[in-house]
From Swiss-Prot:
DNA-dependent RNA polymerase catalyzes the transcription of DNA into RNA using the four ribonucleoside triphosphates as substrates. It comes from Xylella fastidiosa (strain M12). Belongs to the RNA polymerase beta chain family. It is an enzyme of class 2 (transferase). GO terms for cellular component: DNA-directed RNA polymerase complex. Transmembrane segments: none annotated. One of its GO terms (biological process) is DNA-templated transcription. It catalyses: RNA(n) + a ribonucleoside 5'-triphosphate = RNA(n+1) + diphosphate. This is DNA-directed RNA polymerase subunit beta. NCBIfam families: PRK00405.1, rpoB. The RNAP catalytic core consists of 2 alpha, 1 beta, 1 beta' and 1 omega subunit. When a sigma factor is associated with the core the holoenzyme is formed, which can initiate transcription. Pfam families: RNA_pol_Rpb2_1, RNA_pol_Rpb2_2, RNA_pol_Rpb2_3, RNA_pol_Rpb2_45, RNA_pol_Rpb2_6, RNA_pol_Rpb2_7.
Length: 1384
């Protein structure tokens, strides 16, 4: 039985899951948080840090040695400082949340004169290397005041890959095989066959070279190359006639001989017959070691070695040349006894490298290296040294090439080596054994006879020969996840490499000029690289903050796009498709619709990344047909070799698999196997889906396309004014709400001491207090009415009361879209599926007025409007209430500084911040001169540029922030805000101090009451301390008390020290805060003052808003109908929403119907509980009824609810929370069956068919037949008609075409397009058409004249020449065709 926490006891979900959960859902943000923690290693001692992240990057670049080698800069360690501003201040001020990185480096200068490297002097110093962004505890970064998320990237793993072109390159359709070595950084190396079966190589996708050039550059001769890649047949040449072949019978298979093959006695194979496997066996059995063959058997074979006349030293035939009659004669003449030839055939022993050597123009190692140099650096004259250096730097030095740990592991596995660790560079035995430097000797002694490049070429030839398979690049074994930490590390290293170049230049001067490390290192390149990555990288995204689910999903997203990844245009179907290896790692449902489909995925619920960055998913181990509780994580590569059963496989009480054949997955196939064959079993039925898809109840009854829409639309739900838990959920709602970080969770257990709307104070349990300085009080500040990235409102509400006993992890306060710690994205609405006067045609939604009245879907949006006063050429702009030509009425909401009051209700066009801008002198008319002479000079030289409320917006001002540049005097409003802030902070600190002080005194009191006094204020020696005595004593006099009991005296001293320490700490913190508030702000160049005004906008639901269920059933509200007109039930209850029943069958999302039935049952059970409470039923009866609801079905696993844990008060409290409906959980792929839903309906005393008789609201008549009615969780999406509705009066025009701009943001017009023109033509409305194409569009003179005419009351128009005609003329002239208009 599970024990219930304080929060869970308030309301328990009835779970229909039949499978016991073995593994709790892991922390959902772990992929972000763990990755960045490993990158920073901030809490690890400097000496204990691993070579990853910041530490790894610094170690890989340092030491930096000068060109002369006389000076070096070594890395010692690093530490992260304290952030200057906390998260809240960074959001408010538009700053980035980060900590300064200080690296300790050591400058070592060596003595030039001494023969050994003697150290002349050492200087160690701390160097500032810029700000490193810090991650908030919810996995986000604050960059320039906005929350951003770094999305993890799914990219191709480094290593070696074999592939073919699918027959697309050559017209014959022949498969051309290729191999590619991809490093983590460095040059790519490709090998590929051409249609003539020669093998070529490319470096960095440049022009191809024969592969033998690369091998020759490594130091291999022709003979060595042939010896590596071919087996040799040896022929002994008889002096007079005939040849003896050293027989390996297997090598004759498939050949047709021109002579009989005998074994001394009988003929084994007749001439002209093909040798088969049977013949080969006979030959092996006969034991013949040599075979006499005629001379012509040798003709046409390829020599494996040079043949040299021993007496004269003459080269008779070179390796890789063919044997002909003349050469056989020459061999006999020179007395050559034996020659070796290559064993090749057309079937499975291709002569690929032999063909390649024939087209290779080079002969020596240097020639080959020069050829590679010419290909890499065309046009540069090659020198011996340059060619050698370039070749060495390509693949063999760690500075320029890094295969990485992952790449080496993948490489070694693919070429069939046992060990997975190794060197990050490509190794070749021949190349490194020929070199004589220390690093090469180390590599040769460690790695010996292996060769990476040769192994890859051999593997490619094997595949071409028909042995071996190509790789599937879409398999998750070949794609890995690059998370925040790794990307930040790569960016940091790039910055450091830029620093290294500059430092190397300066190091030579360091000795002569006595430079220090601080003078050597310029931190700008590092800081710039990091800032660029976090600020503007494709993977650094503005966080989707619509609701808690959208935050969690955004942080768990995996993108195949981004630097080093794919592009939308190039990605084909295969990459986007669902792959067999996605099972349990990537969600098979959730992905965006549109151009990114399949390129952006979501992590499955239980998936995680392993040390190499590959995705892995957990499985339960199955031993001899019995399922154990042991859980193992397997990656896509490992999973391939096991038989894995599904989570819903039937087992008995001991975990023994009961079916004779179990449905399983093995090597990507689905099949049935006996239980004894099964190795593993899924952990949970929802293992294959992501968090968003796992929130859709009855997902198993929905079509996948609609499930995809449902999962995606939940992310767009706007948090409503009062969140309401879904009546039908899946049981994962609580996990999502807790892990998203929008709720406030208790850090430690204890008792609630104080609660108000903005703060919760917890007195911590004695057992959880750590150390002597810990006062045992936790203070939680709540977020109040803050703007999210999507302009929705973030607000936290306390759930606890004073005196409540809580445990660690309990939910203390709800955030947006959470209800008692559960995710609550929408509202439970009473829904009827029926047509209603055509108002639900094409997915439209009919809504009851009652929904609007009860504010069920009212949402609060917070808009931030900014006014900036800049320094201009003509003088500085000024924020003031003194604005020319504006009525008093327009200014009545501004204070004397020209800024709107908090609490003012404003509408479109109202002034929020008054601002005047100086304008240039213009030529004045005589009338204006007269006016100026009369009324003075002032009003003319400034123009009004105030911040006004944008069109279509109205709301209440809830906050104003004024930022003033350093060195500029603050206005009155800024001082008021400053004073208010200081007062607020002071009160906050005073309250905190008072709470802590109170807790210390309370604890001290319990320790000294009843003790005997030695001395003290107003008390005699030997008296006993009592409570009333302490109450009458000043608090400071408590510390004068001295007792006989040493422990009590210690307690008094400890309390005094604690209070003094806290006092000092709070004073320090207050002075820090105060200086931050009073200091000037760091504004952009040229900005003198900035005012931010926050408006709270209340949006009621209205026609045109988009709504959706969780099953992809979306629609737009077509009409809001009075309650009395809505269809109603027998008892008079009107329905809330009417949906079209035709929206269900074609879309195949039947889950919504099941949800409606179960939701109705849940609501009915709530009504029954309410009736029992109203009738003051006995607690025992209530207990019995709840037991019937929760524990009716013995087949439901150990999740049964133990009501004996609940006291009567707790049970009553829970029952009150259930009156609105008993929440149900129908887990994905393990949900409620039809019988269970019927049983619930029965228990709720509702018709088990799920349909009821409805009556017409207009007439009161019953409808013809019964209707499906019930409760569905319905969401309001962030596609509100208020944001889309737009009308243009007079607005801006495009510069070139002079046509009105388009779009709401540009205050544009509606496009009158081609089809609209056809419509007017069809109606013959010639004048309207002329007006549309001229004065209402781009006839500049015409529209100006029209304006004047309307002002004069003359309603006529004269159409002129449209500007677009002039544009056309200019376009034609740009083609050098003159076109002129003639007056006719």
């Amino acid at each position: 039985m599970t024990s219930y926490s304080f929060t869970e006891k308030k309301r328990i979900r009835k779970d229909f899951g039949k499978h016991r959960s073995i593994l709790k859902v892991p922390f959902l943000l772990a992929i972000q948080v763990d990755s960045y923690r490993a990158f920073l290693q901030g809490d690890v001692e400097s000496s204990q840090r691993k070579d990853i992240g910041l530490h790894g990057a610094l170690k890989s670049v340092f030491p930096i040695v000068s060109y002369s080698g006389n000076a070096a800069l070594e890395y010692v360690g690093y530490k992260l400082g304290e952030p200057m501003f906390d998260e809240r201040e960074c959001r408010q001020r538009g700053m980035s949340y980060g900590a300064p990185l200080r690296v300790t480096v050591r400058l070592v200068i060596y003595d030039r004169e001494s023969s050994t490297k003697a150290v002349k002097y050492i200087k160690e110093q701390e160097v500032y290397l810029g700000e490193i962004p810090l991650m908030t505890e919810n996995g986000t970064f604050i960059v320039n005041g906005t929350e951003r998320v770094i999305v993890s990237q799914l990219h191709r793993s480094p290593g070696v890959f074999f592939d073919h072109d699918r027959g697309k390159t050559h017209s014959s359709g022949k498969l051309l095989y290729s191999a590619r070595i991809i490093p983590c950084r460095g040059s790519w190396l490709d090998f590929e066959f051409d249609p003539k079966d020669a093998l070529f190589t490319r470096i960095d996708r440049r022009r191809k070279l024969p592969v033998s050039i690369l091998l020759r550059a490594l130091g291999y001769s022709n003979e060595e190359i042939l010896g590596e890649f071919f087996e040799i047949n040896t022929f002994h040449i008889n002096p007079d006639k005939g040849v003896q072949l050293e027989l390996v019978p297997e090598r004759l298979r498939g050949e047709i001989l021109s002579f009989n093959l005998t074994d001394g006695g009988g003929v084994i194979v007749e001439a002209g017959k093909r040798i088969t496997a049977r013949h080969v066996k006979q030959l092996e059995a006969s034991g013949i070691s040599a075979l006499a063959v005629p001379d012509d058997y040798l003709i046409g074979r390829i020599l494996s070695h040079d043949v040299i006349d021993a007496t004269t030293g003459e080269l008779l035939a070179s390796a890789n040349s063919e044997v002909n009659e003349d050469r056989i004669v020459a061999f006999r003449k020179a007395g050559i006894e034996s020659v070796g030839t290559l064993w090749v055939n057309d079937l499975d022993r291709g002569a690929y490298l032999s063909n390649t050597l024939r087209i290779d123009p080079t002969r020596t190692q240097l020639e080959a290296q020069v050829e590679i140099y010419r290909m890499m650096r065309p046009g540069e004259p090659p020198t011996k040294e340059a060619a050698q250096n370039l070749f060495h730097n390509l693949f063999f030095t760690f500075d320029r090439y890094d295969l990485s740990m992952v790449g080496r592991m993948k490489f070694n596995r693919r070429v069939g080596r046992k060990e997975v660790a190794g060197e990050p560079v490509l190794y070749d035995k021949k190349y490194f054994s020929d070199r004589n430097d220390e690093e090469s000797r180390r590599l040769v002694s460690k790695l010996g006879e292996t060769s990476d490049i040769l192994d890859v070429i051999k593997g490619l030839c094997e595949i071409r020969n028909g042995r071996g398979v190509v790789d599937d690049i879409d398999h998750l074994g070949n794609r890995r996840v690059r998370s925040v930490g790794e990307m930040a590390e790569n960016v940091f290293r790039v910055g450091l490499v830029r620093v290294e170049r500059a430092v190397k230049e300066r190091l030579s001067m360091a000795e002569s000029e006595g430079l220090t490390p601080q003078e050597l290192i310029n931190a700008k390149p590092v800081a710039a690289a990091i800032k660029e990555f976090f600020g503007s990288s494709q993977l650094s995204q503005f966080m989707d903050q619509n609701n808690p689910l959208s935050e969690v999903t955004h942080k768990r997203r995996l993108s195949a796009l981004g630097p080093g990844g794919l592009t939308r245009e190039r990605a084909g179907f295969e990459v986007r498709d669902v792959h067999l290896s996605h099972y349990g790692c990537l969600c098979t449902i959730e992905t965006p619709e549109g151009p990114n489909i399949g390129l952006i995925n979501s992590l499955a619920v239980f998936a995680r990344t392993n040390q190499y960055g590959f995705l892995e998913t957990p499985y339960r181990k199955v031993v001899e047909g019995r399922v154990t509780d042991e859980v193992e994580y397997l990656s896509a590569i490992e999973e391939n070799q096991y038989v894995i059963a599904q989570a819903n496989t039937l087992t008995d009480d001991n975990g023994q698999l009961t079916e004779s054949f179990v449905p399983c997955r093995f090597q990507g196939e689905s099949l049935l196997k006996p239980p004894s064959y099964v190795h593993y079993m899924d952990v949970s039925p929802m293992q294959t889906v992501s968090v968003a898809a796992a929130l859709v109840p009855f997902l198993e009854h929905d079509d996948a396309n609609r499930a995809l829409m449902g999962a995606n639309m939940q992310r767009q739900a706007v948090p409503t004014l009062r969140a309401q838990k879904p009546l039908v959920g899946t049981g994962i709602e609580r996990t999502v709400a807790l892990d998203s970080g929008v709720t406030v969770n208790a850090r430690r257990g204890g008792v609630i001491d104080q609660v108000d709307a903005g703060r919760i104070v917890v007195k911590v349990n004695e057992s959880e207090i750590i150390g002597a300085t810990d006062a045992g009080v936790d203070i939680y500040g709540l977020i109040k009415y803050t703007r999210s990235n999507q302009n929705t409102c973030i607000n936290q509400r306390p759930l606890v009361n004073v005196g409540d006993i809580i445990a660690s992890g309990d939910v203390l306060a709800d955030g947006p879209s959470t209800d008692i710690g559960e995710l609550a994205l929408g509202q439970n609405m009473l829904i009827a599926f029926m047509p209603w006067n055509g108002y639900n045609f094409e997915d439209s939604i009919l809504l009851s007025e009652r929904v609007v009245e009860e504010d069920r879907y009212t949402t609060i949006h917070i808009e931030e409007l900014t006014c900036i006063a800049r320094d201009t050429k003509l003088g500085s702009e000024e924020i003031s209430a003194d604005i020319p030509n504006v009525s008093e009425q327009a200014l009545n909401r501004l204070d004397e500084s020209g800024v709107v009051y908090i609490g003012a209700e404003v509408r479109a066009g109202d002034i929020l911040v008054g601002k005047v801008t100086p304008k240039g002198e213009s030529q004045l008319t005589p009338e204006e001169k007269l006016l100026r002479a009369i009324f003075g000079e002032k009003a003319s030289d400034v123009k009004d540029s105030s911040l006004r409320v944008p069109p279509g917006m109205d709301g209440t001002v809830i906050d104003v922030q004024v930022f003033t540049r350093d060195g500029i005097e603050k206005d009155k409003r800024a001082h008021q805000i400053e004073e208010y802030e200081i007062k607020r902070v002071k009160k906050d600190f005073d309250d905190q101090f008072r709470i802590l002080e109170g807790a210390i005194y309370a604890r001290l009191r319990s320790q000294i009451v009843g003790k005997v006094v030695n001395s003290g204020v107003d008390i005699k020696k030997g008296e006993v301390i009592t409570g009333p005595y302490l109450d009458g004593l000043k608090k400071s006099d408590w510390f004068a008390l001295r007792m006989k009991d040493e422990v009590a005296v210690e307690a008094i001293d400890r309390a005094q020290k604690q209070i003094q320490a806290y006092q000092k700490e709070f004073d320090q913190r207050f002075s820090d805060k105060r200086s931050k508030i009073t200091q000037g702000d760091d504004l952009a160049p040229g900005v003198l003052k900035m005012v931010k005004v926050f408006l709270a906008v209340k949006r009621c639901i209205q026609c045109g808003d988009k709504m959706a269920g969780r099953h992809g059933n979306k629609g737009v509200i077509s009409n809001i109908v009075p309650v009395e007109d809505m269809p109603f039930m027998e008892d008079g209850t009107p329905v809330d929403i009417v949906l079209n029943p035709l929206g269900v069958p074609s879309r195949m999302n039947i889950g919504q119907i099941l949800e409606v039935h179960l939701g109705w049952a849940a609501k009915g059970l709530g009504h029954r509980i309410q009736r029992m409470l109203e009738a003051n039923a006995a607690i025992a009866d209530l207990r019995k009824f709840l037991n019937e609801i929760y524990n009716h079905d013995k087949s439901l696993v150990g999740e049964r609810v133990d009501l004996s844990q609940f006291s009567d008060d707790e049970l009553l409290n829970m029952a009150k929370n259930l009156t609105d409906g008993v929440p149900m959980a129908s887990p994905v792929f393990d949900g409620a069956s039809e019988q269970e839903i019927k049983r619930m309906l029965d228990l709720a005393e509702l018709p088990t068919g799920g349909q009821t008789q409805l009556y017409d609201g207009h007439t009161g008549e019953p409808f013809d037949r019964k209707t499906t009615v019930g409760y569905m969780h319905y969401l309001k999406l962030n596609h509100l008609v208020d944001d889309k509705m737009h009308a243009r009066s007079t607005g801006p025009y495009s510069l070139v075409t002079q046509q009105p701009l388009g779009g709401k943001a540009q205050f544009g017009g509606q496009r009158f397009g081609e089809m609209e023109v056809w419509a007017l033509e069809a109606y013959g409305a010639a004048y309207t058409l002329q007006e549309m194409l001229t004065v209402k569009s781009d006839d500049v003179q015409g529209r100006n004249q029209m304006y004047k005419n309307i002002v004069d009351g003359d309603h006529q128009m004269v159409a002129g020449m449209p500007e677009s005609f002039n544009v056309l003329v200019k376009e034609i002239r740009s083609l050098a065709i003159n076109i002129e208009l003639e007056d006719n």
